[in-house]
Amino acid sequence: MNWQEHIISDPKILIGKPTIKGTRISVELILDLFSSGWSEKQILDSYPSITSDSVRAVFAYLKDCIQQEFYFPISA
């Protein structure tokens, strides 16, 4: 999955937070919805401007961030 086709960061949109291309829906919002127990179907039904590929791109983006060691350390 090439997340760059779906995720952008534009300083004019949500102060540059990563968003789904063509929307003001942030990567952070999608992750928050999933962590709150929402299913992909619920997200797609609630936000019809995004696609399943866009949702998968959020996770591909997150994976690349983690691989680049772009994360917060967690103490044991």
Model-derived regions: residue spans:
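Short, Lys/Arg-enriched N-terminal segment that forms or immediately precedes the first helix
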Residues: 4-19
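Long, charge-rich, low-complexity alpha-helical segments
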Residues: 25-76
